[in-house]
């Protein structure tokens, strides 16, 4: 695994595929939180203990192949520049919390759909990402990695409570399941607030594209479970999947309603946004996200032909500030970023059309 490859290829291999309900669901993620019995938790540990966790992983797991995932490499946060850390966050490979630690690290698969974060809020956080609505498949992969690690270490586990974690909401299975979903129909019909209220009443959490505290740029929302204690992994997955299927149905109905009642207005909105993306010389990230959402909706509804629906996911990542600066080879001012963002989008659309 090459750091240059990770940094210079903004789109992870798993992002290029499709999955069930990919017209609305962009990705499914499973995260398992675990702690080692022999060490203090990350929130309490000192530098020496944090380094011991890193050394344990370096000795036991680096460059070891796990079928069918291949080999894993180790990225240490204190060996990366702030810009490189930001790129990893923008690619959804690590959390903003891990990027801010000096003694954190990430065990990463070659396909980049599996990462194991070390010394974040817990000793390890196993993350698996899949395109579309594939929670069960993601859980299966996460459990394979979990079993692989558990052969070499003893987890902090209580017979009554389950896995012991730093945050009480993760105690139990330690499982956080989440789905990234594109909901322009519900936003345009002004039904999104009511839907979010219903989701929250069901014990789920709705966040923006980069998790807690982030905005829902481009009409992309992240829906996840909140509590894990007292529920099995299978029940958590089944509950979230059931809610997601209802949201998918509501989004489809909203899109149908717009097409029936406001077809010309919607088509105009889609093509105006396409025109902005195809011709702008300067574009800010928020405007780019809005226009990309409109174009993706136009592709899904058949208004725009000859452009891959994955363009939303791809360009939402490619046009983030960190990745733009990584491509530029160094820091960029706001206007320089807006110029490069617009240039990259125009070029990507031109290639797609040809």
UniProtKB/Swiss-Prot annotation:
Record domain Phosphagen kinase C-terminal: where: 24-254
Uppermost EC category: transferase
GO CC annotation terms, alphabetical: extracellular space
The organism's taxonomy opens as: Bacteria, Bacillati, Bacillota, Bacilli, Bacillales
* Residue positions of motif RDXXRA motif of the pArg binding pocket involved in allosteric regulation: 337-342
Q: Name one GO biological process term.
A: phosphocreatine biosynthetic process
Control of this protein's activity is summarized as: Appears to be allosterically activated by the binding of pArg-containing polypeptides to the pArg-binding pocket localized in the C-terminal domain of McsB.
User: What EC number(s) are associated with this protein in UniProt?
Assistant: 2.7.14.1
Q: Which residues form a coiled coil?
A: none
> What PANTHER family does UniProt report for this protein, alphabetically?
ARGININE KINASE 1-RELATED, ARGININE OR CREATINE KINASE
Q: State what this protein does.
A: Catalyzes the specific phosphorylation of arginine residues in a large number of proteins. Is part of the bacterial stress response system. Protein arginine phosphorylation has a physiologically important role and is involved in the regulation of many critical cellular processes, such as protein homeostasis, motility, competence, and stringent and stress responses, by regulating gene expression and protein activity.
| Descriptive protein name | Protein-arginine kinase
């Amino acid at each position: 695994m090459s750091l240059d490859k990770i940094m210079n290829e903004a789109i992870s291999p798993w992002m290029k595929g499709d999955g069930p309900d990919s017209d609305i669901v962009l990705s499914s993620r499973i995260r398992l939180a675990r702690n080692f019995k022999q060490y203090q938790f990350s929130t309490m540990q000192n530098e020496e203990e944090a380094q011991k966790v890193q050394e344990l992983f370096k000795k036991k797991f680096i460059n070891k192949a796990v079928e069918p995932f291949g080999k894993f490499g180790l990225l240490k946060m204190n060996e990366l520049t702030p810009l490189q850390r930001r790129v990893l966050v923008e690619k959804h490979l690590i959390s903003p919390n891990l990027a801010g630690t000096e003694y954190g690290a990430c065990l990463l698969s070659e396909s980049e759909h599996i990462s194991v974060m070390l010394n974040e809020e817990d000793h390890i956080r196993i993350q698996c990402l899949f395109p579309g609505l594939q929670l069960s498949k993601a859980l299966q992969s996460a459990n394979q990695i979990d079993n692989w690690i558990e052969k070499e270490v003893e987890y902090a586990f209580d017979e009554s409570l389950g896995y012991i974690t730093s945050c009480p909401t993760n105690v139990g299975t330690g499982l956080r399941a989440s789905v990234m979903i594109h909901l322009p129909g519900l936003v345009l019909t002004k039904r999104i607030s009511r839907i979010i209220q219903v989701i929250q009443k069901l014990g789920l959490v709705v966040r923006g594209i980069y998790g807690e505290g982030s905005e829902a740029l481009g009409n992309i929302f992240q829906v996840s479970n909140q509590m894990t204690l007292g529920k099995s992994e299978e029940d958590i997955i089944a509950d979230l999947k059931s809610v997601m299927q209802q949201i998918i149905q509501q989004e489809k109905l909203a899109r149908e309603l717009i097409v029936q009642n406001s077809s010309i207005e919607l088509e105009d909105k889609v093509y105006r946004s396409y025109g902005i993306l195809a011709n702008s010389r300067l574009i800010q990230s928020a405007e780019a996200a809005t226009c990309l959402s409109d174009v993706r909706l136009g592709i899904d509804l058949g208004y725009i032909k000859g452009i891959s629906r994955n363009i939303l996911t791809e360009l939402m990542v490619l046009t983030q500030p960190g990745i733009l600066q990584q491509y530029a080879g160094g820091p960029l001012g706001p206007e320089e970023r807006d110029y490069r963002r617009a240039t990259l989008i125009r070029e990507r659309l031109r290639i797609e059309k040809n």
